Amino acid sequence: MNLRVPQLRFEASDELASLCKAGGDPLRLNVLRALANDSFGVLELAQIFATGQSGISHHLKVLAQARLVATRREGNAIFYRRALAQTELFCGKLHAALLDEVDALELPAEVQQRIAVVHSQRAAASHDFFARIADSFQAQQDLIASLPQYRDSLLGLLDSLNFASSATALEVGPGDGGFLPELARRFAQVTALDNSPAMLELARQRCEREGLANVQLELLDALSQSAASADCVVLNMVLHHFAAPAEAIKQLTPRINLGGSLLITELCSHNQSWARDACGDLWLGFEQDDLARWASAAGLMPEESVYLGLRNGFQIQVRHFRRPLAALTVR
């Protein structure tokens, strides 16, 4: 009697084995946890986990082969982030289940401290940049996307939200204050936060010139617990200067009153690395899905979005996220 030899699916079994191998090391699991809502370069991860560059590179290679991490080039640097689980594909459900369990882990205190150090190093670079270029701020902005190029689209979206006459607004990183007059005309009270004294002085001068009596300027880190809350929180070309954009959205969410809105104007992902030196950008724009995912993780709901193409090749995304009246479950 002839017996049929079963045909093994080597490709599928290899893929499953690769995923199991990647999840079988404590350091790799902690790397996945650290990448939950952030992205880091190889040197940053080596610093965070106090290990050699070659060692962390090996672990990242194993994670990449298992499709647990993805890479994105930021100028001359390559940053790693978690890859999204595609549950409709083979191993996708196991991938998703692994990440769910990883998210229940708590990173060791020393790892969390080193992550904070990396974030502070990024923030210091951004702060130093704005201290140097305050006098040429507008010229620097115009290299990529000046306010007039997206003002009408942003105002159209803002006006469609029909805020009450008593509503309040908070602008994070107002720059030279170019958008403050528009907010002052639409809201009863406007607060503008900046951690750069030089930039806040430019905003103060504009407020004085235009007589914006209902605008309050504060020299304060927007992520500070003492920051004010408002019905509408606005970030115009600011998020790419934050050390940890996903964490920034999460920490800004409590600043939005229940039922209120977060308006983010940002660059779409690009590869113009000169923007780092010329404009102090820590991140070269963002993928649309990343902003939506970070907002959702913070408990915000996606609403209307507008996308603009510029002649210089850059694309702008104007995004609206709403904080629901009832709290959502936040991962």
Named regions from a protein language model:
Residues 145-166:
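Conserved alpha-helix/loop element of class I SAM-dependent methyltransferases that forms part
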Residues 223-233:
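A short acidic, Gly/Pro-enriched loop at the edge of an enzyme's catalytic core
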Residues 232-244:
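A short SAM/SAH-binding and catalytic strip from SAM-dependent methyltransferases
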Residues 261-320:
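C-terminal alpha-helical "lid/dimerization" subdomain adjacent to the S-adenosyl-L-methionine
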